[in-house]
């Protein structure tokens, strides 16, 4: 099986490291990859936002299976495009990736479907959020909506930290 891993970070390096051990892995490619990944997979410097170029690569190299590491290609619908072209993928559809992309979407979906979740308030401007923070007990958790590369959550111990 010819396998393509999308990404260039530690997560993708770990994926490549594990995948290349499989007896089912005939060829392993990574886009764009990194110096470390190039030691275990054939890397190609394709922008992960360029869905058409990735699709063309898959067709040219007869890729059987794609594993997508980073959130952005998932939220931009790469899985949907590849699957619609009969290329198997590991990763959620664009709609499914909304659970990762938007904390507000996920909280509202949980509430609509009676899935237990923590209390929350959403704000579209700093001033309203600050007024609310003046009325709550600490510690409290503040989360940015949208992708934040794993850095969108802050646990605050007091109002000064919340600001």
Feature annotation, model-predicted:
Residues 1-94:
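ATP-binding N-terminal substructure of ATP-dependent carboxylate-amine bond-forming enzymes
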Residues 4-5, 99-163:
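Active-site nucleotide/adenylate-binding loops and adjacent lid/helix of ATP-dependent enzymes
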């Amino acid at each position: 099986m010819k396998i393509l891993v999308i990404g260039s970070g530690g997560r993708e390096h770990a994926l490549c490291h594990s995948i290349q051990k499989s007896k089912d892995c005939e060829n392993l490619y990574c886009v764009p990859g990194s110096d470390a990944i190039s030691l275990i997979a054939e890397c190609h410097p394709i922008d992960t936002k360029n869905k058409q170029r990735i699709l063309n690569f898959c067709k040219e190299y007869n890729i059987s299976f794609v594993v997508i590491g980073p959130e952005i290609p998932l939220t931009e619908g790469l899985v949907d495009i590849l699957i619609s072209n009969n290329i198997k993928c590991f990763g959620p559809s664009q709609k499914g990736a909304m659970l990762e992309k938007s904390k507000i979407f996920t909280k509202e979906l949980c509430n609509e479907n009676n899935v237990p979740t923590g209390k929350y308030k959403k704000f579209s401007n700093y001033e309203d959020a600050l007024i609310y923070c003046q009325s709550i007990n600490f510690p409290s958790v503040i989360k940015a909506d949208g992708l934040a590369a794993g850095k969108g959550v802050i646990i605050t111990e007091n109002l000064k930290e919340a600001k």
